[in-house]
Amino acid sequence: MARLCAFLMILVMMSYYWSACSLGCDLPHTYNLGNKRALTVLEEMRRLPPLSCLKDRKDFGFPLEKVDNQQIQKAQAILVLRDLTQQILNLFTSKDLSATWNATLLDSFCNDLHQQLNDLKACVMQEPPLTQEDSLLAVRTYFHRITVYLRKKKHSLCAWEVIRAEVWRALSSSTNLLARLSEEKE
């Protein structure tokens, strides 16, 4: 029984290895599932009705043209997605959120992001990209604007609700980018 279990574990690890290491570094299926789960949990984290924070809405200038660029190479896209995921994780693990979110949902969301980040890091190590600094700078500048906004709004519940919705849109864009890259591969 122990040998069978060990054999099955090796098969699982090899299937993960081959999916991550194949030509073009295909992200494991778990990445897409984690992304969908993160979007669902982020939606569940809503604490206020959308209309209650209209006065706090702001256009943070999500760099969609940099993230979903038709000319972006897969290796560059992986790097941009990794940075986007890392910035979201940094935002939702900051000390300034205290009791803003339900702890169980926040943990679930952050765990999904950690898993996605690990998948993306494995791909970056497999296929070092030709860095596209302007894309990375655009993502970092976007998150800097979000951080400044939160500070200016003193991390209010409405400000965090606006950010939650903004991050949901950013994650949705990353899902669209991955879908497009997958279609191009086929």
Curated annotation (Swiss-Prot):
Stretch forming the signal peptide: 1-24
Keywords from the UniProt entry: Antiviral defense, Cytokine, Disulfide bond, Glycoprotein, Secreted, Signal
Disulfide feature: C25-C123, C53-C158
Keyword check for Phosphoprotein: no
InterPro entries, alphabetized: 4_helix_cytokine-like_core, Interferon_alpha/beta/delta
Gene3D superfamilies xrefs: 1.20.1250.10
Annotated protein name in UniProt: Interferon alpha-4
One of the record's GO molecular function terms: cytokine activity
Positions bearing carbohydrate: N102
The gene coding this protein: Ifna4
Main function: Produced by macrophages, IFN-alpha have antiviral activities. Interferon stimulates the production of two enzymes: a protein kinase and an oligoadenylate synthetase.
Cell division found in the keyword field: no
UniProt-listed Pfam families: Interferon
SUPFAM superfamilies hit by this protein: 4-helical cytokines
Chief localisation class: secreted
GO biological process: one example: natural killer cell activation involved in immune response
Protein's cellular compartments: Secreted
Family designation: Belongs to the alpha/beta interferon family.
Gene Ontology cellular component terms for the protein in this record: extracellular space
